A protein has these predicted regions:
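Hydrophobic structural segments
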Residues: 3, 7-270
Length: 270
């Protein structure tokens, strides 16, 4: 047997960074990202030899240090470090300092944000809640889009739904807007920041929106309009990206060593 799939199991081999990118973009094309987003190779060399990939949600100092320690040649994150127009890269600011550190250590940097939300995260999250009769919450391209709506596995109280979300996504807590004894049968789930999804979810007629980063006014307004909201936090649902991409790369590119950031909330509640 020849090729990557036929190489000896347990051994890792160098690949061009571009080869890895092509395999990722075959499954998660960049054109499915929202127009405001910044995805793809954000720093580094497409011809660089890579044998280790480090996967994380964000390119924090801790993540970059771990990527360096692991010997990674490619850092793969969900959230892009660079969003707006970057006019300079210097050690005088936080973003520039991190980019310099990556480049100095020979680590290319790739972000896959809303293209992954559209083509991976939404269905994965809906599946973890056992939603049925699912539909796209807000279309982006070719019938694919952000979030999903569907029927919960059973009718339950809003409080029970909150506990269900905590259990399925391994969360210590969630915030709930709405009466805890309200019965819910349908839900919209939109991982990440869900304020912009409140209106589409309300128009879809679901009983509860499950998302993150719901501000005070959006939460109380939606509850007053009859749609409950469960705020699982920005990280709370999106952390599933790390393990999902690990499985994807291990299956698609078994010659690579895949390392991941630990799954934990980036803050503490005291």
């Amino acid at each position: 047997m020849t090729g990557i799939a036929g190489r000896q199991k347990g051994r890792h081999y160098n690949m061009k960074c571009q080869e890895i990118i092509e395999r990722i973009e075959r499954r998660f094309p960049r054109e499915y990202a929202c127009s405001w987003d910044n995805v793809g190779l954000l720093a580094g060399d497409r011809q660089q030899e890579v044998d280790t990939v480090y996967i994380a949600l964000d390119a924090t100092d801790e993540v970059i240090e771990a990527a360096v320690s692991s010997g990674a040649g490619l850092l793969l994150t969900h959230h892009p470090m660079i969003f707006g127009g970057l006019k300079s890269v210097t050690a005088d600011d936080y973003t520039g300092e991190r980019l310099i550190r990556l480049i100095k250590n020979g680590i290319s940097y790739y972000a896959m944000h809303t293209n992954y939300d559209v083509l991976g995260m939404a269905d994965l999250a809906a599946g973890m809640l056992d939603l049925t009769e699912t539909e796209v919450l807000e279309e982006v391209l070719d019938g694919e889009g952000i979030g999903r709506t569907g029927r919960l596995p059973k009718i339950m109280t809003l409080e029970e739904c909150g506990q269900f979300v905590k259990e399925r996504f391994s969360l210590p807590n969630v915030k709930i807007f709405g009466e805890l004894n309200k019965m819910v049968a349908t839900a919209a789930i939109s991982p990440g920041s869900g304020k912009s999804m409140a209106r589409p979810a309300f128009e879809a007629g679901v009983d509860v929106l499950i998302s993150g980063d719901i501000d005070h006014h959006t939460g109380i307004d939606m509850a007053d309009c009859g749609m409950a909201v469960i705020d699982a936090g920005h990280y709370g649902i999106e952390h599933i990206y790390i393990e999902d991409m690990k499985k994807f790369l291990e299956k698609e590119l078994p010659a690579l060593k895949i390392c991941t950031a630990p799954a934990r909330q980036p803050f503490q509640v005291i």
